[in-house]
Curated annotation (Swiss-Prot):
Residues 23-31, 76-81 are periplasmic. It comes from Escherichia coli (strain K12). InterPro entries: Small_drug/metabolite_transptr, Small_multidrug_res, Spermidine_export_MdtJ. Disulfide bonds: none annotated. The gene is mdtJ. Coiled coil: none annotated. This is Spermidine export protein MdtJ.
Amino acid sequence: MYIYWILLGLAIATEITGTLSMKWASVSEGNGGFILMLVMISLSYIFLSFAVKKIALGVAYALWEGIGILFITLFSVLLFDESLSLMKIAGLTTLVAGIVLIKSGTRKARKPELEVNHGAV
């Protein structure tokens, strides 16, 4: 089961890299950023598609998108001098709270109990 969480982590990391490279491509010369964006976002969807084999789709997608937005925003501030207003901080805080609630509200499906037949009476 852990491999699927690792795949989800890879999906998140490649989504962050792909989205940041989109911004990098828009402010720099050449096509390197666009190529990196295409490769990373493609890999992100591939990793996500494998992760949802064992992780609930709603949970996987919420984590993928939510954690992606959080880190893309933080890296955009650090790398591209974008602003981080109080309203953005409040939104990110709400996002993190939502991710925690979605993850904590997910239960594993119970395995069906085996019926024991002690013989016909």
